[in-house]
Amino acid sequence: MNFIERSDIVWKTVPYLRQGQTKNYDYRLKLNEPLANWDVWDYWESERIYSMKSHLKKGDVFFDIGTEAGWCNLVYADIVGPENMVLIEPTPEFWANIHALWYKNYSVNPMACYSGLMGDKTTDTRKGSDLNAWGEKHLGPIIDRNKYVYIHDNTESIPMIRLDDYVSEVGITPDVLNIDVEGAELLVFQGAEKTLRDNNLKIFVSIHDDLGIRDYDTTPENTISYLESFGYSGEFLAKNHEAHWYFEKR
């Protein structure tokens, strides 16, 4: 990993989500280099964002499960309001990126943060408000390369919690789930039985069919049928690097 000290971060304003073939964009994000220098900003995952703008509203409580390097959540926050975002990420080093990007773009705090994995079992011994905190490395240097922690390859013993347990402990119930967890999608849903059953959630999930099969012996059909068992119907949005779906009870 390459680290960049906070004082050495170079910031750029990046236009994101081009409006057709015009020179107009839906968003202008303040991003750090080298992230800001990507060449994908015109249309990256545009189908997901358009679906979110169609289905979501200000005030929706949005659980972002797999916040990663901390830029997509800036767009989600614009849609539902930054004060309604719950940021969830297991990789310790990403928390500095998430923190730096968040406060470069917003002056209000997110609703909550959870530094850990979400899955089908709970190993996290923290309780209550201790589960709502920025990752311990959030004030450190940012990283400029991707580094992931996986449920199946958790060599750092990152704590894990079921979504149902998190909801119960912190007292926050989501309206929206956004899940991008590199193949472990079904495990997250299996830890969210009560929340899925008791609510009509708006669910955006990126299904990684290759990683799910390789690392978790799970097919996309397994994940889709599990959600259908709770009364959810799916809408396929797009497939580029993974398959993007939207689910709700209809």
Features from the language model and the residues they span:
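Conserved acidic-Pro-Pro-aromatic motif
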Residues: V86, D165-R250
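Conserved Rossmann-like nucleotide-binding pocket used by diverse enzymes
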Residues: F63, V86, Y114, P159, ...
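Glycine-rich adenosyl-binding loop in Rossmann-like folds that engage adenosine-containing cofactors
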Residues: Q21-Y50, V108-N109, Y114-I172
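Acceptor-substrate binding/catalytic loop of class I
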Residues: E93, H152-I158, I207-D217
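Short helix-capping segments at alpha-helix termini
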Residues: K104-N109, L196-N200
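Short, glycine/acidic-enriched loop or turn micro-motifs at the edges of active sites
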Residues: T67-A69, P92, D120, V181-G183, ...
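S-adenosyl-L-methionine
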Residues: M1-Y106, Y150-H152, V170, T219-Y226, ...
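Hydrophobic packing residues within well-ordered alpha-helices of enzyme cores
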Residues: Y76, I98, W102, R126-K127, ...
